[in-house]
Amino acid sequence: MDIAASEFAKDGHYELKTNGDWKSSDDLANWYQWIIDNFPVVSIEDGLGENDWDGWKYLTGRFNDRLQLVGDDLFVTNTKLLQKGIDMGAANAILIKPNQIGSLTETIDAVKLAKEHGYRCVMSHRSGETEDTSIAHLAVGLGTGQIKTVRVKSILSKIIELSRDADEIIIATDYDREGELIGMETVKAAGVDMTKVKRAKFS
C-alpha cells in the first residue's frame, strides 16, 4: 500500500478529507493495525509524513516484525536521510528511484547503505514512466529483490527484461485506471509465459 501520507500531513497531524478530521501518528498506526489484522497487507509505503521522524520511529518499533515499512518521501534515495533513518530506527525499507537522486553512483551508494543495515530495497519508477527497462537491469544488478512499476505496457516491458536476467519473478503491481489489479503468479523467469498475466476485479 502506498499511503503517500505527506500529501495530507500538516504540523505533525494528518487531515482525512473524507470527514475533515485530523489524526495523529498514533491514530494512523492504529488504522494500519486494523488493516493488517483484516487484510493480507505485507508492505506500507510512506505510511507517515516525510517530516514525522518521531512518528516513523514509533511506527517502525510497532510493526517492524510484521510489515515492510518503505520510506519514499522520507528518504528520497538520499544517503544522508537514509542514515538518519537508520540511526533513529525509522522504516525498514527504502524506495530506490535512480532518476530522483540523479546519478547511478548515488543510487548504488543508497542500495549499499540500506543493505549494510538490513533495510530492504525496492527499485522504482517515478510518477511518470515509459517502457524503458533500465530499472529492471538495476533491480537485478543491485540485487534489490523488488521492483515497483505502473501501467500495463511499462510493467510488461520490465517483466520481459527481468526474464532475461532473473531466476524467478514475483510481481505485485498497482491498480490500473479501471480499478483492476494487474497481478502475476510466481514464474520461472526463463521463458516467461505472458498468458500468466491476469486481471482480477476487487469487489
Task: Describe each model-derived feature in a short phrase.
Residues M1-V152:
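Catalytic core of soluble alpha/beta enzymes
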Residues K153-S203:
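Toprim catalytic domain recognition across nucleic-acid enzymes
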